[in-house]
Amino acid sequence: MSTTTAILCAFGVYLLLMIGIGVWCMKKTTGADDYFLGGRGLSGPVAALSAQASDMSGWLLMGLPGSVYALGTGQAWIAVGLGLGTIANWLIIAKPLRAYTIVANNSMTLPEFFGNRYHDKKKILLGISSVIIVVFFLVYTASALASGGKLFNTVFGIDYHVALFIGAAVILIYTFMGGFLAVCTTDFVQGTLMLIALLVVPIVAWGFVSGDFSALLTQSGVNSEHYMSLMYNGDHPITPIEIISNLAWGLGYCGMPHILIRFMAIKNEKELRKSSVIAIVWVIISLTLAVAIGVIGRAYLLPAILGETAGAPSAESVFIQMIQETFTNKINLPFIGGIFICGILAAIMSTADSQLLVCSSAVSADIYQDIFKPEATDKEVLNVGRITTIVVAALAFIIAWNPNSSVMALVSDAWAGLGSAFGPLVVMSLFWKRTNLPGAIAGLLSGALTVIIWDYIPLIGGQTPYVATGLYSLVVGFIISLLFIIVVSLITKAPEESIVEEFETYKAYKEQ
């Protein structure tokens, strides 16, 4: 069996497994609550790994190792920020959010929770938050599909557009059939595969590295002291603003609907405690090993870097090249190498399917049912959700059609937009009973608009504020949104007594 055939077989087994899970979960999905929230029946391990797998995307196995490979360990600050954000999200947000969404009329989605939390009879919060989700997640889904297309193209030489279609079709099939349960179950498998790949590949590759490591780094064309220092970005000292901006990525977690929905869907408090431990351990190990892959790759792939062998690695393909070099050239186990490359595909798919489902729920449950047709039956909402899944996937496919499109550059803006719009509002909704509807609307709009202005409007000497200052828009957007929520809530009418009573009920329920 040729190397390419062996890797193709590994991909085929993996993709068929994902579709099989979708078929199995379809039999368990009977209504909208099952399709969008899994009937609030997620176990701890499934909730933990599905949340983390859907969060990290291909960035964990391509973007982070690639940036460390190119510029050194100073790129690890973003991993530190994401690790701290994950820990805070599970320990501070998860339990209260699950409790409040149950008390607030068993809310199935984040926009629905906001509407129920503030008794928004005019559906203003619901409409604004749903539109924000659809816009940002459409771009997110497109970027994930594009990553999958590029992966197939890199590994097999398949035409990008054919590869894009294959990846999109598989994700659409199991998401369409099984909904949230299929997404979480496949994400559990994918999260496990990602962790195994991260554990095995760098350890095996390290066994083939010989010689003084610092000398190998120097031969590869970098200053070894700068490369291994957290205080350098390449050969340039890292600035405080760069550190703050990278750490600030962690702020986004409390505003990510595709992660927060896992908290809402966990079966009970016991499973929540279990999932918190699993998720935190997973993210610490995974981020650490992803950084290690970039560093080890610099020495391990030295012959290719120096041109002594064919195929000098590009930054983002360092993990792929490490797998191929180890399991094809060194120990001749191409099928196993193919399974580990599937770990990269798993990272991409686990994010795309979650984003697809969040868009679907925003349109069918939050916009169609809650705003336009409150009398819609459960079956009707389920059918609209499935149709929306197809439409959103098709739109994302169109956006991702150009392999050289700038959609990937928009991912950080989407993270900032969602984190700034939803993050402060989630926190204040859970922990400050004085927050009212005007404050919530002000926070939602100010957070999203600040990110757009900061990243796209040339206000400072013909430059955008981001270009002029280098400060990540999430930092500014989060702070401004938080201030708007507090100030507007204090200068407008206090929440109705029924809202305050519901808040007290939630507090009591949370402590049970």
Protein language model regions, located:
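Membrane-embedded helix-loop-helix hairpins and adjacent transmembrane boundary segments
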Residues: M1-Q512
